[in-house]
Structures are given as structure tokens and as C-alpha cells.
């Protein structure tokens, strides 16, 4: 398994956790999960061959969704946060 696949799997599992727990978890827990997703994205995007990776589009979609979700979490809009996460998961699946 390559580094990009590992980063994608870490991001995807983190986003699935977030999608299922936007309403029932503490803000700090959600921030930690989003931080883990963004750290995996940074690690993947720093790779030399990221531009040629088949995981480039899904990783980018999940990173964009995580960034938008973070903004909504900071504003206290958890339902919009969940919608962004689900949209990112949908985009990454294509």
C-alpha cells in the first residue's frame, strides 16, 4: 500500500467519523478529528509524485471538505458542517 493510499484511507475514515458524530461529540473531539484529516492531506500533498497520483482528486476533495467543515464548526453550524463532509465524501468516491 502506497503513502497516498494510506493518507486517503486515514482521511476517509476521519471524515466518516465526523459525518456520523457532528451532533453528539464535543467540539474539541471534532477539531481533533478534522486536524488529523488535514494532517494526512498535508502529508500526501507534500509528496513528490502527488501530482501524478490517482489519489490526487479524492485527497483534494476531502481536504477541501475538511477545510469548509472546520469553518462551519467554528461558526457553530454543525448541520452545514455535516453537509460539507458528506459532499466531500461523495466527490471523493467518484
Cite the ranges covered by each PLM segment.
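Short terminal alpha-helical segments
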Residues: 1-27, 31-34, 89-93
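Charged, low-complexity interaction regions
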Residues: 21-27, 46-54, 72-80
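Generic L/I/V-rich hydrophobic alpha-helical segments across diverse proteins
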Residues: 8-11, 15, 34, 38-41, ...
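A generic short alpha-helical patch detector that favors 3-5-residue windows
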Residues: 3, 29, 54-61
Amino acid at each position: 500500500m502506497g503513502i497516498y493510499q494510506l493518507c486517503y484511507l486515514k482521511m476517509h475514515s476521519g471524515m466518516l467519523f465526523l459525518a456520523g458524530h457532528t451532533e453528539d461529540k464535543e467540539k474539541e473531539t471534532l477539531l481533533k478529528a478534522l486536524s488529523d484529516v488535514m494532517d494526512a492531506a498535508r502529508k500526501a500533498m507534500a509528496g513528490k509524485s502527488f501530482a501524478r497520483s490517482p489519489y490526487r482528486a479524492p485527497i483534494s476533495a476531502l481536504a477541501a471538505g475538511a477545510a469548509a467543515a472546520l469553518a462551519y464548526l467554528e461558526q457553530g453550524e454543525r448541520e452545514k458542517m455535516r453537509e460539507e463532509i458528506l459532499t466531500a465524501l461523495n466527490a471523493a468516491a467518484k
